[in-house]
Amino acid sequence: MIKILGRHLRESFKSLGRNTWMTFASISAVTVTLILVGVFLVIMLNLNNMATNAEKQVEIKVLIDLTADQKAQDKLQNDIKELKGIQSVTFSSKEKELDQLVDSFGDSGKSLTMKDQENPLNDAFVVKTTDPHDTPNVAKKIEKMDHVYKVTYGKEEVSRLFKVVGVSRNIGIALIIGLVFTAMFLISNTIKITIFARRKEIEIMKLVGATNWFIRWPFFLEGLLLGVFGSVIPIALVLSTYQYVIGWVVPKVQGSFVSLLPYNPFVFQVSLVLIAIGAVIGVWGSLTSIRKFLRV
């Protein structure tokens, strides 16, 4: 078996060498396609990561009525915790709320510092849901509870965020699927030309008794090699470009939800995906292209 496989592998390399221009055309088609797939894959996965981080930061701010005593606050906290889909309920004192308000204004916020004046803000509960998409429904339920002064969660911002996240994910998936099928079509046609040039050889092999799979194996391996060779340049570009992008972007967005996936193991996972896609494209193109030539 190993001997036969070695023979088929040698035949595949010889065929690639004999049909230099066809080999170049096939590898070029795979390379261009995988570069596009790689770019969109990196963008889509990072957008998905940013969207997930942004979703995690969605929270509900429940302002507690000033008339609520400690017992009423404890009851309100327990009532919120008992709601379905609640991940956490954290108490935030009005002093902490004031500090956050001052910090949000930067240097100009220093003028808001209270000296001898009473803090006018409310104590609050910061609520996070297990599923960020449940935020609007949970907020409506909390609004109806006793001793709740006001509920805020950035309604318009949250709705806009979920729409952007959904659209970006769908567009990314659609583009990658479309590019993969385009690549399969291009490789199939390219390999058909290669096989057509060798149709006499295939017919002779068939006439002398060679089985269909014996004939298919060299083309199977040839397609596999074309796909793998075609993934080399895209992988090199992904490795080098992503490293540069991380070094340039990360320091500028540190601390925000706009965070890129870490270089390792992300780029190596993407590299494996590109190799796999290239191999599948090449094998699929070879097997579908040779099918009609086996009907002698």
Swiss-Prot record:
Gene3D superfamilies: 3.30.70.3040
Membrane topology: Multi-pass membrane protein
Keyword list, A-Z: Cell cycle, Cell division, Cell membrane, Membrane, Transmembrane, Transmembrane helix
Localisation per UniProt entry: Cell membrane; Membrane raft
Any one GO BP annotation for this protein: positive regulation of sporulation resulting in formation of a cellular spore
Disruption phenotype: Cells lacking this gene and ftsE, the previous gene in the operon, delay sporulation onset, as a result of which they form a medial rather than polar septum at the onset of sporulation. This is presumably due to slower phosphorylation and activation of the spo0A transcriptional regulator. However, at later time points these cells undergo polar division and eventually form smaller than wild-type mature spores.
Primary site of residence: membrane
Residues on Extracellular side: 45-170, 240-264
Entry GO terms, CC: membrane raft; plasma membrane
Transmembrane annotation, as ranges: 24-44, 171-191, 219-239, 265-285
Cytoplasmic side: 1-23, 192-218, 286-296
Quaternary structure and partners: Interacts with FtsE. Interacts with FloT.
Family to which this protein belongs: Belongs to the ABC-4 integral membrane protein family. FtsX subfamily.
Function recorded in the entry: Part of the ABC transporter FtsEX involved in asymmetric cellular division facilitating the initiation of sporulation. May act as an importer, possibly at the top of a hierarchical cascade leading to the correct temporal initiation of sporulation. Acts upstream of the histidine kinases KinA, KinB and KinC, the RapA phosphatase and the Spo0A sporulation protein.
The protein's name in its UniProt record: Cell division protein FtsX
Organism: Bacillus subtilis (strain 168)
Phylogenetic classification of the source organism: Bacteria, Bacillati, Bacillota, Bacilli, Bacillales
